[in-house]
Structures are given as structure tokens and as C-alpha cells.
Amino acid sequence: MNSTKENVFILGISCFYHDSAACLLQDGNIVAAAQEERFTRKKHDPRFPKHAIRYCLDEAGIDITDLSYLAYYDKPFLTFERLLMSYLTTAPRGLRSWLQSMPQWLGKKLHIPRVVRNETGYGGDVLFTEHHEAHAASAFYMSPLTRRRF
């Protein structure tokens, strides 16, 4: 685990679906967050959020090597299995959709650690969160209520 001045930096990213983004936490507090479309001017930009990542790191005054962790918003194999089962239950109706989505999955989503390393030079482990738990956690942690449920 890398850290700067005993700080824990966690970079969260989402990409290859819609609205790619990055968010940087320092010791559990949000330092910076940005959607890739703010830099590329492409609405709902699904590409790897390299500009958003650079912005977050620059805001904190750190480099990619200072990250303690990098987290991806989804567990690609879990989602891939769910999609496969969905397509199989609707076959052959879903064949066209399946064929359109597979290049994205096979080329990028199933290889997130490699994509992250190639795009950023990050050499640490990539952590994966369960997509719907990530949504629930964002509501939980941002709630102003003293008691939270999800």
C-alpha cells in the first residue's frame, strides 16, 4: 500500500458503460470528483476517465503512485454472468444485442486491471465493488440522517 504523509488515497473509477468518472478520497473524505464528459465534451462519455483521473490527482497534488487503492465500480465477471444468463433465457431474440455488447466486454470490461495499468501506469491492486452495493453505499454515506438503512 502506498501513502503520502500517512494519508490513505483511494481513487474510484467507473467507465465503459455511461458517464465515466473518477473520485478521489483522502482518509475517507472526498478531495475531488469529475465526470469524463466535462473534459471531452462528449455527453455520457463511456471511455476510460483519463482526464477525470488526472484532474482528481492534480487537485490533491499527488501522483498515481501515491494511491493506496484503486477501486472499480463493478465486478465485471459477476455482471458478465448475469448478462449471459439474461441473453440465454431470451435466445434467439437477444442475439443481436449480445453480439453488439460482447466486443466491449471481451475487450475491456473483463480486463480492467490491465486497462488501468496501460492507461495510468498504476501498479497496485484494483479492487472491485458490487455495482448495486456501491449505489446503496453512496446513499448511506451521504445521508444527513443519524440513523441510516439500506
List the model feature ranges, each with a label.
Residues M1-F150:
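Short acidic/glycine-rich loops and adjacent helix/strand connectors
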